[in-house]
């Protein structure tokens, strides 16, 4: 029979067992953190009707989407988790309690060009809060505070959540008489980190059609820097010239004040007028998060406030605020930079039992007792030589191997080897269990990420 050469498609990540354990550990920290803030887990279909996903219109989304026909059905793979959320809330409105707080960790699909650190299938980790008619400004401060707690729990320390408000930007552009061009301006400014200030200015004049004076005024505005207080004080100098600007500045002052109340240190968040977010549906506070020691990575977490996202599915006003972590990309770049903690265990089991007798009943009973005590235990039942069994234990990376032969069974003892130190003991079950649990608690110390 002819065989097919196994391969993984370009742009799709497939991990070996050890890094998969690291990825799972990251996801578990996210789930634990989000649950601590009262978010409920949600899962939505990977496949939706194309008209649902593309309700807003085509453009770049339609170029990147995986779309196919199945019989008469026009179907597409989801390209993010936000649009399915909008559909979900509109569909199940009568069964939900508002504000509706959900988190979702799931795969999304985009048919863009595969390149280093960019994937066509990747995990996103989203949190969103959806209101019914209104949504208090406090939520716009709580969302980035959750990201601070999440990244800190992962082990990151040198990161910065950059905060802005779209109303400030729209109000400022209105002052310049550029209301109609505001969307194009924000999409251009959003490229600042990628193409630099000179190219942004050129794009503003050549592509957007601004005058040199208008482009210079915008570049001066987005270049306002300093401490959060200094930036907010500088913005206060523009007050009174446009109502939308004043509203945005009031919201930004409130968000920064509440961020401090939520316990986010000022070194971890900054008012940054270059943050615009290219997506049109953002209407208020916007966020981007970067790793200070690795600016080349770009934003690893972004989001913001939106007021009309569900308008394509319902007449109800369902404002929301949310943020998304590109989990696959973050995991990839952390691995590339050597920032994933190699000391944390990645073995699928804590104990591997190697029976030394033909009758496996005692080994099965021992495995059952260890599992009942909460110890992840694997029973090796293959009839192979001792060396092959130990090679298997080494390859798995299990911290403890238990041998159970006639002598141990007769004496009511357990022979246990610490695979790190090489020390081997022969103790009662209770003493062996105590030794294993103490050793595991020491091994599980530390964060997933090596503190940068």
Task: Identify the function of each model-found stretch.
Residues 97:
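Phosphate/dinucleotide-binding and metal-coordinating scaffold of catalytic cores
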Residues 42, 46-76:
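Polyanion/phosphate-binding surface patch
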Residues 1-20, 69, 179-182:
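Auxiliary tRNA-acceptor-end handling modules of aminoacyl-tRNA synthetases
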Residues 19-37, 48-51, 72, 84-94, ...:
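Positively charged, Gly/Ser-enriched RNA/tRNA-binding surfaces
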């Amino acid at each position: 029979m002819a065989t097919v050469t196994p391969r993984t498609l370009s742009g799709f990540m497939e991990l070996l067992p050890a890094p998969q354990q690291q990825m799972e550990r990251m996801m578990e920290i996210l789930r634990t953190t989000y649950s601590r803030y009262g978010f409920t887990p949600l899962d939505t279909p990977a496949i939706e009707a194309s008209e649902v996903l593309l309700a807003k219109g085509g453009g770049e989304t339609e170029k990147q989407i995986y779309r196919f026909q199945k019989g008469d059905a026009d179907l597409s793979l989801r390209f993010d988790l936000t649009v399915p959320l909008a559909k979900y809330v509109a569909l199940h409105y009568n069964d939900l309690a508002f504000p509706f707080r959900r988190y979702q960790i799931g795969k999304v699909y985009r048919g863009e060009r595969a390149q280093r650190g960019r994937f066509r299938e990747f995990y996103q980790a989203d949190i969103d809060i959806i209101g019914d008619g209104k949504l208090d400004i406090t939520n716009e401060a709580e969302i980035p505070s959750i990201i601070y707690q999440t990244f800190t729990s992962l082990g990151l320390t040198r990161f910065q959540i950059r905060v802005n408000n779209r109303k400030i930007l729209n109000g400022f552009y209105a002052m310049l008489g550029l209301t109609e061009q505001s969307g194009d301006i924000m999409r251009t400014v959003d490229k600042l980190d990628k193409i630099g200030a000179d190219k942004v200015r050129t794009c503003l004049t050549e592509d957007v059609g601004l005058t040199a004076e208008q482009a210079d005024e915008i570049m001066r505005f987005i270049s306002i820097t300093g401490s959060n207080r200094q930036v907010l004080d500088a913005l206060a100098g523009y007050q009174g010239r446009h109502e939308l600007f004043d509203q945005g500045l009031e919201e930004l002052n409130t968000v920064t004040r509440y961020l401090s109340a939520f316990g986010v240190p000022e070194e971890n968040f900054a008012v940054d007028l270059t943050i615009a977010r290219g997506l049109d549906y953002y209407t208020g506070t916007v966020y981007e998060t970067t790793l200070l020691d690795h600016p080349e990575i770009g934003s690893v977490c972004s989001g913001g406030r939106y007021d009309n996202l569900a308008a394509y599915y319902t007449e109800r006003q369902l404002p929301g605020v949310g943020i998304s972590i590109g989990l696959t990309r973050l995991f990839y770049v952390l691995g590339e930079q050597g920032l994933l903690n190699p000391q944390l265990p990645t073995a699928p089991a804590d104990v591997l039992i190697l029976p030394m007798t033909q009758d496996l009943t005692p080994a099965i009973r021992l495995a059952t007792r260890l599992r009942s005590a909460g110890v992840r235990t694997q029973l090796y039942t293959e009839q192979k030589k001792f060396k092959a069994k130990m090679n298997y234990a080494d390859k798995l990376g299990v911290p403890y191997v238990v041998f159970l032969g006639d002598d141990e069974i007769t004496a009511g003892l357990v022979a246990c080897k610490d695979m790190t130190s090489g020390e081997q003991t022969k103790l009662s079950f209770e003493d062996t269990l105590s030794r294993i649990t103490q050793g595991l608690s020491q091994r599980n110390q530390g964060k997933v990420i090596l503190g940068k």
